[in-house]
Design a protein with these regions (language model features):
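Aromatic-acidic/polar surface patches that form glycan- and anion
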Residues: 72, 76, 138, 189
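Catalytic core of non-heme Fe(II) oxygenases with the double-stranded beta-helix
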Residues: 106-185, 191-195, 199-210
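Non-heme Fe(II)/2-oxoglutarate
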Residues: 1-113, 133
Length: 210
């Protein structure tokens, strides 16, 4: 069994607190779970009633389509465990002060949730084509992420406040504070671009380890 140190041995840091970005190449096993969501989400996109399940945010009307990823595809996955653990590592790296009594961040992070709403967890898939863009924006929650699922042309993500332009690779994930603004310029090529974004909450109440 791999240790957490072995699982996250390829983490890279970009910038500094309070705007630090954590970059990682997802293990193939985890990335395969992410890619398994493409067809269910594409099926929603291609349905004549797709507007009913449109994930609405700043990117709505700029990306061709965005839809939430159903909870059933996220719950009990290694992906969810990976996300929670790397977020705890992020908090440790920035010396976040709201730690448990034992000094850990165990159960300090959770997927942002929308109970009773079709969006479910605050995790969604973006389908982007020629002419699409994503204007400058930030996210809800406390920690936010981008996963580059399909991007053969490596469409850059721009972080204006850091003066940083990220050239993505498929399977790469960025984790950063929710307030960090970013954008994607208009897509000039014909290829399909697919990304996943999600938002996490930092839980403020003391949690017990059982």
């Amino acid at each position: 069994m791999k240790t957490l140190e072995q699982i996250f041995d390829n983490v890279e840091l970009i910038g500094q607190t309070p705007n630090m970005i954590m970059k990682v190449q997802l293990p193939d096993f985890i990335f395969d779970e992410v890619k398994s969501w493409i067809e269910p989400c594409r099926s929603i996109k291609d349905n004549e009633y797709a507007e009913l399940l449109n994930h609405r945010n700043v990117g709505t009307g700029h990306n061709t389509y965005q839809t939430g990823i159903a909870k059933k595809y996220v719950d009990n996955t290694y992906f969810l465990g990976y996300v929670i653990n790397i977020a705890e590592l992020y908090l440790k790296t920035i010396n976040y002060q709201n730690v448990n009594m034992d000094g850990s961040f165990y159960r300090k992070v959770a997927m942002r949730d929308n109970p009773g709403h079709y969006d479910g967890y605050d995790i969604w898939m973006n389908f982007t084509y020629k002419g699409d863009d994503n204007p400058v924006h930030n996210h809800a929650g406390n920690l936010s992420s981008i996963i580059y699922v399909k991007d053969e042309d490596s469409q850059p993500t721009i972080f204006p406040s850091l003066n940083y332009t990220h050239q993505p690779k498929e399977g790469e994930m960025l984790l950063f504070p929710n307030h960090l603004q970013h954008m994607v310029e208009e897509k000039q090529t014909e290829s399909e671009r697919i990304s996943v974004s999600y938002n996490l909450n930092i839980l403020q109440s003391e949690q017990q380890m059982y």
